[in-house]
């Protein structure tokens, strides 16, 4: 087979016992591919491993894990300076794998690994919050954030993305909307939000299409606000057609400012960030990513 440049796989420590992954790596190595493997143990490991990847001269750094691992690796990559910055490869090994699923990464590990190593690179956007924290997929606030951050790890491990829905149903009687004001380019809204989705990608929370029109290379963030005084009637309403739905507010902008009279929490690719003021902006063509040719999130 054709020769491919070396890759470095940054593997979430929870996936070290994945036998099919070990077999896929060994098979590709036998075919002549050079694949370095590093395992994360604590926060900050990804930054160190990306620095090592640059010293090794690899062409691709592969994020092996869920949305949080992809976030950590991609954030480390965009912080690199100079030329010859490795591309991002994606190996979906998390609970929900929302970003990987939405961009069309194969579920089969051997196929996903081959794509991560040999796929074509495409420049994609990322988003940054308050000039510090980044996300590649989505920032969610309100009802959805509290569900994803509070769902027990054992439930997620046992049921995957369905666990978010089950835990949400258990908590409906205690969840209240967040009052806030949101501004963007040609956009202004103020009111009570049950769910806020600001997407570079389209889905979060285990497959929920919060921002169905989002693209990862258009220089824009997609905003969706689900409003209403009561959660259950609103959810029933949003199951209907989106057209002319009074409980859905939409917008698109390269930036959004959110202000709240009280502390609210946004979930950034699985990582919570709390505060009263958020400035979220797009970083156009921030990194190169190996994606399938029929990726639905490309313009």
UniProtKB/Swiss-Prot annotation:
GO MF annotations in UniProt: ATP binding; lipid kinase activity; magnesium ion binding
Official protein name in the record: Probable lipid kinase YegS
Subcellular location: Cytoplasm
Family: Belongs to the diacylglycerol/lipid kinase family. YegS lipid kinase subfamily.
Named cofactor requirement(s): Mg(2+); Ca(2+)
Active-site residue numbers: 271 (proton acceptor)
Principal localisation: cytoplasm
Function per UniProt: Probably phosphorylates lipids; the in vivo substrate is unknown.
Record InterPro entries: ATP-NAD_kinase_N, Diacylglycerol/lipid_kinase, Diacylglycerol_kinase_cat_dom, Lip_kinase_YegS, Lipid_Phosphate_FormReg, NAD/diacylglycerol_kinase_sf, YegS/DAGK_C
Residue stretches making up the DAGKc domain: 2-133
Cofactor binding note of this UniProt entry: Binds 1 Mg(2+) ion per subunit. Ca(2+) may be able to substitute.
Residues involved in Mg(2+) binding: 215, 218, 220
Residues that bind ATP: 40, 66-72, 95
Domain of life from the UniProt record: Bacteria
EC number: 2.7.1.-
Leader sequence segment: none
GO cellular component, as recorded: cytoplasm; plasma membrane
Listed Gene3D superfamilies: 2.60.200.40, Probable inorganic polyphosphate/atp-NAD kinase, domain 1
Matches recorded under HAMAP family: YegS
Key words, A-Z: ATP-binding, Cytoplasm, Kinase, Lipid biosynthesis, Lipid metabolism, Magnesium, Metal-binding, Nucleotide-binding, Phospholipid biosynthesis, Phospholipid metabolism, Transferase
Gene Ontology BP annotations: phospholipid biosynthetic process
């Amino acid at each position: 087979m054709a020769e491919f440049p070396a890759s470095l796989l940054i593997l979430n420590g929870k996936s070290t016992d994945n036998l099919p992954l070990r077999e896929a790596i060994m098979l590709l190595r036998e075919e002549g591919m050079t694949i370095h493997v590093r395992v994360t143990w604590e926060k900050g490991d990804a930054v160190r491993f990306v620095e090592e990847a640059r010293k090794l001269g690899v062409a691709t750094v592969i994020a092996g894990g869920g949305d949080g691992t992809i976030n950590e690796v991609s954030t480390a990559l965009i912080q690199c300076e100079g030329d010859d910055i490795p591309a991002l490869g994606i190996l979906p090994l998390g609970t929900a794998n929302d970003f990987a699923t939405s961009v069309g990464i194969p579920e089969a590990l051997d196929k996903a690994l081959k794509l991560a190593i040999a796929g074509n690179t495409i420049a994609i956007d990322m988003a940054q919050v308050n000039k510090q924290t980044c996300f590649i997929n989505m920032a969610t606030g309100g009802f959805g954030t509290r569900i994803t951050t509070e769902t027990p790890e054992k439930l997620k491990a046992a049921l995957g993305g369905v666990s978010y829905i089950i835990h949400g149903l258990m908590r409906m009687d205690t969840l209240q909307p967040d009052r806030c004001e949101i501004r963007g380019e040609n956009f202004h809204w103020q009111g009570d939000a049950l769910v806020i989705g600001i997407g570079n990608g389209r889905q979060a929370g285990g497959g929920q299409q919060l921002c169905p029109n989002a693209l990862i290379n258009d220089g824009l963030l997609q905003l969706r606000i689900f409003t209403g005084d009561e959660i259950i009637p609103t959810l029933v309403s949003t199951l209907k057609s989106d057209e002319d739905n009074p409980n859905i507010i939409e917008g698109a902008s390269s930036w959004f400012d959110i202000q709240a009279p009280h502390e609210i929490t946004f979930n950034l690719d699985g990582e919570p960030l709390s505060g009263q003021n958020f400035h979220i902006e797009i970083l156009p063509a921030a990194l190169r990513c190996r994606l399938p040719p029929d990726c639905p999130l490309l313009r």
